[in-house]
Amino acid sequence: MACIYPTTFYTSLPTKSLNMGISLTTILILSVAVLLSTAAPPSCRECYQSLHYRGEMQQYFTYHTHIERSCYGNLIEECVESGKSYYKVKNLGVCGSRNGAICPRGKQWLCFTKIGQWGVNTQVLEDIKREQIIAKAKASKPTTPPENRPRHFHSFIQKL
């Protein structure tokens, strides 16, 4: 990404452009706006749905864990919502099906998680992560030798 510094910016403008009525402030503001717009991650605003709840209209972000490949084309965009990355695609099966695949009905745009799309169930991943945490906790637990306890109460009485 190119950086534009005001000192370089002012000296690099030809004097002819100053006479055409374009102010340096306008050019600087437009340049900064272009730089900021390219740096910001795209939002997932197309994946919000309106819902009436208790007499109020509310917006909810909806995403899917898996969408059939034939429901969307080759144009896959990344978007960010609440710090998490999603894929955003145009729904080619708005009526509910396309090429035999069942597609989400009535939505023009679809967002889906990256990991669920490629055939990995998110519940399986959560279980694997949980097992890893438990295994790590067991490994870090200090091992103490077992105490000499009798296995049965009657063997304890016999020793006395």
Swiss-Prot record:
It is found in: Secreted. GO terms for cellular component: extracellular space. Interacts (secreted) with SLC1A5; mainly at cell surface. It comes from the Eukaryota. Residues 1-39 form the signal peptide. Residues 137-160 are annotated as: Disordered. GO terms for biological process: syncytium formation. Keywords: ERV, Secreted, Signal, Transposable element. Its main location: secreted. The gene is ERVH48-1. The human genome contains a high percentage of proviral-like elements, also called endogenous retroviruses (ERVs) that are the genomic traces of ancient infections of the germline by exogenous retroviruses. Although most of these elements are defective, some have conserved a functional envelope (env) gene, most probably diverted by the host for its benefit. This is Suppressyn. Coiled coil: none annotated. Specifically expressed in placenta by extravillous trophoblasts and syncytiotrophoblasts (at protein level). May play a role in trophoblasts syncytialization, the spontaneous fusion of their plasma membranes, an essential process in placental development. May negatively regulate cell-cell fusion by interacting with SLC1A5, the probable receptor on the cell surface of the fusogenic syncytin-1/ERVW-1.
